[in-house]
């Protein structure tokens, strides 16, 4: 009997697929089938897959013209014969050889329809929890009801009863982006509860994954967000709904705003999302709606005027510092560099937790600039949850010229979204 069918969509992953496959083949549970779906790769991916098929009897290859990973996974679901289904991205891997066996045994012991554990990111050779919301990390083993499940992300760290998925006809929407969270929420909604394990069951590679959102991808991204909000609200999945709303204003909102004026469907999606937000607000949850119509037009004009004032003002400053040396900090530095603004340094509260140099620029402690604080402007380039705290710290240290730059405004300044 095949215990687990592992579904792996593959598109131009020649650099990573071997590590992924070796991770799967090293698993201590032997009763598995590996379904590899080539999504019209143009590099050596298919050649590598065929080499594995030749030497491994449990490897099956499916092929399709380039249509996206969601459609590829749906092919895998239909072809699967295992008791459970697992999903893996072709550039990711399992943390240990007994990971799948541990998850499978736990699922059997508990009778779980959906069972899995925590996740860990892998970025530039470093294992880290940075960038993961709390729903990706569990503090103990146990059941979590659909109402309390805290996120719509991280579907790949779970296994799913195959007959459940197939009989309920739960498939990935045919979106180019954000197609997995709607699948995940639909599965949880139908299962009613999920068994979650404290241990890490999946390693997610992050360093090379970036999407430049052209209109088609942006619309699909917005559709996926809308679908998740509709599903979670319909099913009473309040924790997942609120988690998604908490990150809506940033990259997601900027992505929608940039295309709303030229795409009527994007306008409609924004309106549909706002209907969910207003419904959520009946529960006295303070979530700001997205801008739409004339308000959005005026906002976009104001943002461009603010961009001009900011750049002009920074050109006059003696010293420009960027607080934060992470993803946001690097994006802000690149934006300012393209516009002719010279950054003196990245600054942080504790240099021992950061590299000494990031992207060729020194990382220094903010305290090094206290004596020169009147000559410095500090741009706060962190995620929103930290900005107010950092602003207060800077105020207490005597810095007065402080500019918190939100993710949403940065993307609108740039006129593009890359996530």
Labelled PLM ranges:
Residues 85:
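Short aromatic/hydrophobic "clamp" motif used to bind/position activated sugar donors
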Residues 69, 90-195, 204-218, 260:
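Donor-binding/catalytic cores of nucleotide-activated saccharide
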Residues 12-26:
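Short, well-formed alpha-helical segments that are part of the catalytic scaffolds
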Residues 292-419:
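Hydrophobic, well-ordered beta-alpha structural blocks that scaffold small-molecule cofactor pockets
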Residues 23, 38-47:
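A conserved acidic beta->alpha catalytic loop
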Residues 31-40, 60-65, 89-90:
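Short beta-strand/loop segment that forms part of the nucleotide-sugar
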Residues 205-319, 325-338, 380, 419:
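C-terminal subregions of glycosyltransferases and related glycan-biosynthesis enzymes
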Residues 64-80, 90:
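Glycine-rich, basic loop-to-helix element that forms the pyrophosphate-binding segment
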């Amino acid at each position: 009997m095949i215990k687990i069918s592992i579904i792996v969509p593959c598109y131009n992953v020649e650099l990573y697929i071997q590590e992924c496959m070796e991770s799967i083949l090293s698993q201590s549970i032997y009763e598995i089938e590996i379904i590899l779906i080539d999504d019209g790769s143009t590099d050596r991916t298919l050649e590598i897959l065929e080499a594995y098929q030749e030497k491994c009897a449990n490897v099956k290859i499916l092929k399709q013209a380039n249509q996206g990973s969601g459609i590829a996974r749906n092919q895998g679901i239909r072809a699967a014969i295992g008791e459970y289904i697992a999903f893996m991205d072709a550039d990711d891997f399992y943390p240990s050889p007994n990971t799948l066996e541990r998850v499978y045994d736990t699922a059997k012991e508990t009778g779980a329809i959906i069972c899995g554990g925590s996740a860990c990111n892998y970025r530039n050779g470093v294992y880290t929890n940075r960038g993961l919301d709390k729903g990706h990390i569990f503090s103990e083993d146990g059941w979590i009801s659909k109402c309390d499940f805290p996120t719509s992300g991280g579907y790949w760290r779970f296994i799913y009863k195959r007959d459940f998925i197939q009989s309920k006809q739960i498939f990935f929407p045919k979106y180019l982006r954000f197609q997995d969270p709607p699948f995940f929420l639909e599965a949880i909604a139908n299962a009613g509860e999920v068994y979650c394990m404290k241990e890490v069951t999946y390693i997610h590679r992050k360093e090379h994954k970036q999407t430049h959102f052209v209109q088609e991808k942006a619309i699909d991204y917005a559709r996926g967000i809308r679908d998740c909000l509709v599903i979670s609200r319909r099913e009473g999945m309040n924790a997942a709904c609120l988690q998604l709303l908490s990150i809506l204003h940033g990259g997601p909102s900027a992505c929608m705003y940039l295309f709303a004026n030229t795409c009527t469907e994007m306008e409609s999606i924004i309106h549909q999302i706002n209907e969910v937000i207003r419904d959520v607000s009946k529960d006295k949850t303070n979530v700001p709606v997205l801008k739409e119509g004339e308000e959005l037009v005026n906002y976009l004009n104001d943002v461009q005027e603010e961009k001009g004032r900011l750049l002009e003002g920074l050109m006059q400053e003696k010293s420009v510092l960027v607080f934060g040396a992470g993803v946001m900090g690097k994006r802000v530095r690149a934006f300012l560099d393209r516009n002719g603004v010279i950054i003196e340094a990245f600054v942080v509260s504790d240099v021992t937790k950061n590299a000494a140099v990031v992207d060729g620029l020194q990382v220094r402690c903010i305290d090094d600039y206290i004596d020169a604080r009147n000559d410095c402007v500090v741009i706060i380039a962190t995620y929103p949850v930290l900005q107010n705290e950092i602003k207060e710290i800077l105020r207490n240290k005597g810095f007065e010229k402080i500019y918190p730059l939100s993710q949403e405004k940065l993307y609108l300044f740039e006129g593009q979204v890359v996530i």
